[in-house]
Swiss-Prot record:
SUPFAM superfamilies: Macro domain-like. This is Macro domain-containing protein VPA0103. Signal peptide: none annotated. PANTHER family: GANGLIOSIDE INDUCED DIFFERENTIATION ASSOCIATED PROTEIN 2-RELATED, MACRO DOMAIN-CONTAINING PROTEIN. Pfam families: Macro.
Length: 170
């Protein structure tokens, strides 16, 4: 069984190799966890994001991820994952699966052993938490990610409970 733990708390306090950010396609900060990570990381993170090549302002398409330095965070990297806006995609599940998979693939490719993850797309992007938790657990349980210590940081007791239920189902 893969090493997955659940924490109710602030992802910006995680001491890990990589922190996954629930980013937007521009990668320039925003609300929720994205804004919190950018504020905690300081100017080095926004500068690293500006250095990522863009096409018409898009640095990371939906369902994909990019890796940058972590600035002032207690991590080596920030992995910016762009999940789906739930009601804007015909198949949001596939996009969310891809965002988690690309994040974990980048973690492995950059020799990370520990990763902190948020509930991608569950804030302003409107993904139902129960469905998102099922998708996240299904991806994280894949054998190719067995070497990673994955820690989900969840912002409320309700979210923690939803993720605990999903974890026990897998």
């Amino acid at each position: 069984m893969n090493a997955i733990s659940l924490v109710q708390g602030d992802i910006t306090t995680a001491h890990v190799d990589a922190i996954v950010n629930a980013a937007n396609p521009r990668m320039l900060g925003g609300g929720g966890v994205d804004g919190a990570i950018h504020r905690a990381a300081g100017p080095a993170l926004i500068n690293a994001c500006y250095a990522v090549d863009d096409v018409d302002g898009i640095r990371c398409p939906f369902g994909d991820a990019r890796i940058t330095e972590a600035g002032n965070l207690n991590a080596r990297y920030v992995i910016h994952a762009v999940g789906p806006i739930y009601d804007k995609f015909a198949d949001p599940k596939t996009v969310l699966e891809s965002a988690y998979q690309r994040s974990l693939d980048l973690a492995l490719a950059n020799h990370c052993q520990s990763v902190a993850l948020p509930a991608i797309s569950c804030g302003v992007y409107g993904y139902p938490p129960q469905e998102a938790a099922e998708v996240a657990m299904a991806v994280c349980q894949r054998p190719e990610y067995a070497a990673l210590d994955m820690r989900f940081y969840l912002f409320s007791e309700e979210m923690l409970s939803i993720w605990q239920h999903a974890l026990t189902q897998h």
